Amino acid sequence: MKFFISLITTSLLFFSGSLLAGSHAKTIMLSTKGPGAGNPFWASVEAGAKDAAEELGVNLIILSPPQESDVMAQVAQIEDQIAKGVDGIAIAPTDPNAVAPILDDAMAS
């Protein structure tokens, strides 16, 4: 679990280093596989991400589907945040094949 939290923190550091070049605070979306409140693992991931975002001055949006198996909800959340113009996305995909095309399009734009 500490490895995954470190990975999220490192991702936030990477994104903040490349994104904070502008004058306004950047927004990063963290999409987890399932609800953090009911799962100690994801609750720890969320807590670590919030701490890192606060330390780095990054706006953090944490979203997860209502159920870990709800692929379409995660896809809709990602598409919504991309449409809103988030500056970065850190994701634990529910189904990597379902989100890959969306993320490829986001990186290309």
Q: Residue ranges of each PLM-predicted region?
A:
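N-terminal signal peptide c-region/cleavage motif recognized by signal peptidases
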Residues: S16-S18
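A residue-level marker of the well-folded mature domains of exported/periplasmic proteins
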Residues: L20-S109
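Sec-dependent signal peptide recognition
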Residues: K2-T10
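Short intrinsically disordered, low-complexity coil segments enriched in acidic
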Residues: M1-K2, S109
